[in-house]
Amino acid sequence: MLTKCASSSDPFMDWCKPSRSRNKRFDSVIKAFGFIQTFGEACIYKKVSGSSVAFLILYVDDILLIGNDIEFLDSIKGYLNKNFSTKDFGEAAYIVGIKIYRDRSRRLIGLSQRTYLDKVLKKFKMDQAKKGFLPVLQGVKLSQTQCPTTAEGREKMKVIPYASAICSIMYAILCTRPDVYLSISLVGRYQSNPRVDHWTAVKNILKYLKRTKDMFLVYGGDKELVVNGYVDASF
């Protein structure tokens, strides 16, 4: 885990430049060393040399280096130190709100967002709520017919942070909690005109996340990748 502080040539002037200019400079410097920007994600770069592979992930001024060859990674860090003033924090343990756990004996990496979920629960005043067993309660049916049809009903819902709660949960889904993807997709349909019933469903998802906030996403372990697909007939 590295943090990029400034240009070694002229730190003050370099960091007075707009963020876009700094990003363009970093992009050109890292590509000159053989890194290729990935097509799907502009902040991820890849470099391959023989059997050695390295990924560089840039988030604002923080850099996460991943690779299968320590000497290869050291050469990359040396190159970065020549072009930028950097600080090496060692093995990555926490980045963008995600806690990283390792079990090297079993070749496992776990990603947890407990701290982030605690903040979300507190933000929406659900930190003292009861824990939910499932993200979607059995028998609950949501539909457009439940949406407010009067100005009074819509005005009442304006004080409810409906869309904000959904966006907060979506970040967890994208990073470590795909298990609530279906439930959030159901309540997300009513963001333009939600009713109390829809908000109750959102709070139920938060209750479930409160009960399961210690769960984390685990990668690795099995040598063979087995993919299971599921179809939701109601979609």
Question: Which residues does each PLM region occupy?
Answer:
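Long, low-complexity, charge-biased intrinsically disordered regions
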Residues: M1-F235
